[in-house]
Amino acid sequence: MTKMCCAGLAGCVLFLAVALPAASEPARYEADVCVYGGTASGVMAGVAAARAGRSVVIAEPSRWLGGMVGGGLRVSIDCKYPRDIGGLTKMMLEEDDRIGGESPHERQQAFRDLFRRLADTHGLQVLYEHRLGSVETAGGRLVSITLDYAPPGIDGCPAAKATGPAAARIRARVFIDASYEGDLMAGAGVPWCVGRESAAAYNESLAGVRNLRSFDLDPYVRPGDPSSGLLPMIDPEPVGPAGSASRHTMAYNFRLQFVGPGEGRPVPAPSEEYAARYALVRRALETNRAFVGWPNGNYNRQSVISGGIPGRQSGYAEADWRERSAIWREWSEHVRIMHALTGSTQTLKPGEYPDSEDFPPQLYIRLARRMLGAYVMTQHDLAYETRIDDPVGLGFYFVDIYPCRLVVVDGKVATEGETNELVSPGPYPIAYRSLTPKREDCRNLLVPVCLSASHVALSSMRMEPTYMILGESAGIAAVRAIEEEAAVQDIDLPRYLAALKEAGQVLHWDGTSYDDFRRGWLKWKTKQDQPAETVEPET
């Protein structure tokens, strides 16, 4: 029986497919491979499949390709150990070097142009401003997806609702969910999770609630009076014991770029709608008892609050588009309010985002859903405590978890969750099985971004170069599944690994020194562990 699944909801409701009236029939597309999400990973997946002669359609909710690469990041910024990066990602690193620039954050427009050229050169059909509406499955396979036309705002904020009835339907033999949110995966009925597992779930020492950083700042509406309630932005839930599970994942933010007064576009004045929520920031600034790291391009880890709205990210992954739009808008307002409260005179750097009023069009969604797939990558895989026989590429970054929320500890405000630990002796292999659902859940879907991993493991693998590597490997796997007429779980592994090597992917660490990266990480970590007042805001 064919079933349709309404996507974009917290739950998934199955119902029988019904014929639409002729007047509302969506445009129809057919391809060998459908990629949902034109992130950097999604483009790499599409290019890999197209290079093998397969037709590809990419559905992208925004007006741009590349996601965070071109939306605030460059390929090289989180690529501290490039020698073990190959394939298309290596090519992109070389392009990054050619693009040049004085800062690892600038020239964002050049990367958006680069991704568009890649799509054009390889004949990828891209449906911009189209997002998932519903999913059709039959016999354990995805059959088609129906897309809604929902143009985002000029600044990239998702539309609260689509402009009308279903706009497009894509049928494909293999689907790849390369979105940051994992909407196609969820819509297909594949199990997934959000938040942080407990330390006991996978026996991970870095998992769960941990690392409280306390500030000499009163959390109550009336200082010293718990009965007056907590200030906005402070999580009222109990902190929980160390290592316990939490629904909160790491903070999101925009990767902003500023220049001096008069050199760029002024940051717009904030609205009054959210002003009352910032009493905590006002108190920190007025009492000078907690570091407020603004302006900066990141989430300053010593700051009580900076680029991220504490805890607000935790509802994003499971929200519908109306709620996501509201959350995204709150982040835009957060930038304006923080700029106004701190009295910053810096301006938005011109030329980086000329078609979104110099404001980044992509919210940095560090983690959202995580698939519960055929294999779950964990801290033990990063530490080489397991054996991976189906590697699709190498991860290399440390476990990097930004503060997750604000809590109360002993009557003071504290951040919770920040973790930065290098547990890997060297670049570690990522299992192909972590890109595939369990066979009984879906047989023609690959997931290179919201892959099957614990919160700890994905906190290392979440870097854009790694996502790009996984995207290319997913594209090659899709080709193998089509050519072998097999489920993605059943492709011939030796032939697949040979295809990855032929594409230039690096599958094994050669054991040579990781010391340069380790020394750099230790230097960075030492700086992060200094008292907040002695650390300059990140730029």
Residue ranges of model-derived segments:
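Beta1/beta-strand and adjacent pyrophosphate-binding region of the FAD-binding site
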Residues: 28-39
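N-terminal Rossmann-fold NAD(P) dinucleotide-binding loop
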Residues: 42
